[in-house]
Amino acid sequence: MAYSSKPWGYVIYRTTYTPESTSLWPRAIDTINTYVAHFTLETLTEQNKESSYEEIISRLENIPIQDPTLDGATYDELRVHFASWLQTQDRRGESGDRDLPRARFRTFLVIDQAALEMIANAPNPADEGADPRAVSRPCLTAVAAQHHEGRRLRPTRSARGPRDVNEGQLFPGWMKVPIFTLHELWEANSERLDLIELCPSDFVDEPVWEP
């Protein structure tokens, strides 16, 4: 897994402020951290690197952002807020490099009411007998911090077929991400891959990332 010695984790926006959401929000954040920790350990174990788990997970730092003025905010409105937030975080180390991990500049996460309810009520993946389908179902939205309308995804097609820059679907600037894959999304972002390079091109209603 691609981790530097810096803190890692995403900025997570809350865009619903109903009375019910106030109690669900901290549960949802706890659930996300639980899932990231559980599946990070699972991946490290598969790679025979579980000895590094404690050090890696100690640097996990998802950053929840709550602001009632963002109730129902659009992705473009969140991009403006995110850009302003980054300006307050743009510290530089002794080498002159940014202290923030690169992946945190490229993508942020959004939780609306539907996602909030699903995540807050998700089962603990470590529980014996947890339904795998229930574990894999909760999703949130990953949003590209910078998005230019009109960019297209690479079409899924035979390499021998004719190429046309206008053949791929338009990239919406976001995709749904199951929370059990967030550690893999971070790794992909850390390897200099933007959402447009990760977003599936064969979606019908909405893109859902599958690593």
Task: Identify the residue ranges that each predicted region occupies.
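Extended, charge-biased low-complexity segments
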Residues: M1-P172
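Acidic, proline/glycine-rich low-complexity IDRs
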Residues: R151-P211
